[in-house]
Amino acid sequence: MIVRNEAHIVHEVLDCVAPYISTWCIVDTGSEDGTQEIIRAHMAGLGIPGELFERPWKNFGHNRTEALQLAAGRADYIWIVDADDLVIGTPDFSQLSADSCELRYGPPDGFTYWRQQVFRDGLPWRYGGVVHEFIQCDQPFQIQRLLGDYHLESRRLGGRNLDPEKYARDRDLLLVEVERDPEDSRSVFYLAQSYFDLGDFANARRWYQRRAEMGGWEEEVYYSMLRVGESMLRLEEPWPLVQDAFLRAWESRPTRAEALHAVACYYRQQGRFQLGHIFAQRAASIPVPPDDILFVWAGAHSWAALDEQAVCASNLGQHSEAFSIFRNLLAGDKLSPEDRVRVAINRDFSVPTKLEIATAYPAVGIHTTRPRSDADVTVTVSCGPNPHNAEATLNSVLNSCTDRSRISRLVVDDAELSEADRTALRHRYPLAQSLDAPFREPAAARLRRISEGIQTRYWLHIPADWRFFAPERLLSRLARVLESEREVLAAGVNFEDASELTGRNAEEAIVRRGAGTGRYVLTDMMPRGPVMIDMERLGKIGGVDSGAADVHGDLTARAIAAGLRTATLDEVLCVYVG
């Protein structure tokens, strides 16, 4: 490592690399903030031997090479890091066998690139370039890529990155290099990068174009062509020319999605949703290229193009497509907290259409569907006095539970309906059975009566006037949550026991996942909305108390006393309309 004025941050990278190293060699190039003593003291505290050298600054290529030479003979491999790097996860170096090893920078679903950072000792390694240096060797060498659940985060917080003139200094150094060697494609590329980072998009476009025309490394050519399009877009050049630049970039490397995503994004912003949808759908079909190493925005492949496709589909009235994509994005872990809120809100725009579909009478299969021999869920639905609302609730349940063959019995608490309406309901829903209960029975007594008729392991209770709208294997999902969490009494359908669309999801830190569960969270309150209860665990706390003034509060208190918790799915799948 080479350092200069890194006192504010260097201890973090030292802590990160400590578990993996047996010695260290750090070159200070002129720190004036005490970096030298901080490093010596910190490594002594970690109990790792090593040596700090002080050498004058010349340029990145020279000083990196000097550091490599000073580290020679100390270990089997030399790991080059920067003072502001962090190691996220746990890299496994135990299988190192090649002469050089590439490490992943950036999270797997973010902006990712691979860099050679680990080198076998004893080979004639050196760095070239005055800035944006690159490794060279005077003899052939083998490279391997270190895969695994880790990445390095280059935080741009070191002394050099705090210099407001950093990009201008890089530009000036690279201009000298390009003048010295006009065919130095790497210097041309990073000169274009420096202009882009400075916001000088006219010069960035010029130098990216020059780099693209030089040919050579296909990934660098592609990225230069992509940046030509991005520079033209920032310069507000005519869209047909900008689009042509993006499409030429994609045509040069059709395994990359960034250019098509940029085109889709533009059309969506312009309200031209048909075209946006076409380009987004094509971009979303491209998997993350497994072998590319240069500035891969994996998010364009894994979620951002899908996001654009769903927004366009929603605006085109293709709500089933939009709803499905948004739900899949929310079910994953690729979205930032800010994007998760936005995607959840966008998903909810399609809910009115989904409700209209879900509450329609399920004519197909309603008279022929029979429970499986191993059906293990009893569904109970409470009804108010309005037969239309009762039918809408039943329709939404039957349409949304695509695994309804798991229903052993469908019991309808229809005491508040007229006799004529009850007869009509039984005719329209042959699977439904009426609950034999008196009119206007207290809530706790009614729930106790319902629970006493449950003969299955799982009980899904749906209070009156709820509407489901998301087709899925809901019964199986709720049951899997209860199977996965042995200390959970009940699993609610809606996050935060919401009764309306909220656009909210749980923070990633508290989300749980299991096979077939999707995202869910643990809570300590018995849901008042639709909920699946484990009847064995309900029996262990004495069942429903028919005399409780607040039946949900009573169940919550007794569950907590017995060491049981509750859970909810991490989304809203039904709404209350009463």
Regions found by a protein language model. Name each.
Residues G61-L68, A75-V81, D85-R206, G216, ...:
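Catalytic-site signature of metal-activated, phosphate-bearing donor transferases
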Residues R55-G73, A437-I454:
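Glycine-rich, basic loop-to-helix element that forms the pyrophosphate-binding segment
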Residues C16, Y20, V27-M43, P56-W57, ...:
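A conserved acidic beta->alpha catalytic loop
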Residues Y190, R227, A262, E308, ...:
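"A position-specific structural signal for the A-helix of alpha-solenoid helical repeats
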Residues T90-P108, A470-A490:
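Conserved donor-nucleotide/metal-binding helix-loop-beta segment in metal-dependent transferases, i.e.
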Residues N5-T23, N386-C401:
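Short, well-formed alpha-helical segments that are part of the catalytic scaffolds
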